[in-house]
């Protein structure tokens, strides 16, 4: 329950949620997805502002992505070795688990076809809604970036046109749009550097890529050597330190962790410490 509510994904069995009944798996899947919703939607529902809750663009996009990803994977993996009901359950569970960064698993999705794994990687990048317990880049940021791309394309086609980017019916200022662009650039830079450092260990591309992806977005399992049936225990010390940083940076939305390494912060901290020591010595001499 706690692992689902906090989208933390901690289990007490080696088989994760795969060791429980189909009923339990459906319950966990539903609540994982619900905890990935922007909590403002629940506030609107409690206040009986149903139109605002159901008109939230991010929430609609979130459920649309889950539905589309589940449908694509179902079509790709369905065969006669498993019933349609079981296939749907496992697909919805894994899509919900990775979309919300919970990280539970009912099957070894590393054995799924390549197309299904690509879909899972995409939703691992996107993540849950802003204002939820989930990780990832967040659906709202992805929507804003897509709208920014659309506006730039329209500007090329109609140079004199002026178009505002709106979210939830409200126009966004340029500062908000720029902050999202900066976040994407920062995410890409940290991802690239981490990927390079982890790749020094010499493992395969899939392991290195998904190890960085799953830790930066706080997903849990990746693919190949860090897949759902394996763990990160075999990685080198360097890789583990890099991935530890990625986990913290991803959970804190990148910038708080980067600020810790800014020279100005250390300079001010050092100078502040020196001032306090001087004042302490001065008081001791006066006494």
Give residue ranges: language-model regions.
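Membrane-proximal intracellular helices of multi-pass ion channels
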Residues: 1-287
């Amino acid at each position: 329950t706690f692992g689902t509510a906090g989208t933390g994904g901690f289990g007490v069995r080696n088989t994760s949620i795969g060791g429980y009944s189909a009923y339990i798996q459906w319950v966990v899947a539903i609540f994982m997805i619900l905890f990935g919703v922007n909590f403002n939607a629940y506030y609107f529902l409690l206040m009986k502002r149903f139109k605002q809750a159901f008109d939230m663009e991010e929430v609609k996009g979130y459920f649309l992505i889950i539905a589309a990803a589940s449908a694509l994977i179902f079509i790709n993996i369905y065969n006669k070795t498993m019933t349609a009901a079981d296939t749907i359950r496992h697909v919805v569970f894994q899509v919900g688990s990775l979309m919300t960064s919970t990280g539970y698993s009912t099957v070894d999705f590393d054995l799924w076809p390549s197309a299904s794994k690509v879909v899972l990687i995409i939703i691992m990048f996107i993540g849950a809604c802003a204002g939820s317990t989930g990780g990832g880049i967040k659906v709202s940021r992805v929507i804003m970036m897509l709208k920014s791309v659309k506006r730039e394309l329209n500007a090329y086609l109609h140079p004199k046109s002026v178009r505002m980017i709106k979210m939830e019916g409200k126009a966004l200022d340029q500062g908000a749009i720029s902050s999202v662009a900066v976040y994407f650039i920062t995410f890409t830079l940290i991802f690239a550097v981490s990927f390079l450092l982890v790749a020094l260990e010499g493992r395969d591309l899939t392991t290195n890529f998904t190890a960085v992806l799953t830790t930066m977005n706080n997903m849990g399992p990746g693919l190949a050597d860090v897949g759902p049936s394996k763990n990160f225990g075999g990685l080198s010390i360097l890789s583990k330190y890099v991935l530890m940083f990625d986990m913290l940076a991803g959970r804190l939305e990148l910038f708080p962790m980067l600020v810790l390494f800014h020279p100005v912060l250390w300079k001010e901290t050092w100078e502040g410490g020196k001032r306090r020591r001087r004042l302490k010595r001065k008081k001791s001499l006066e006494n």
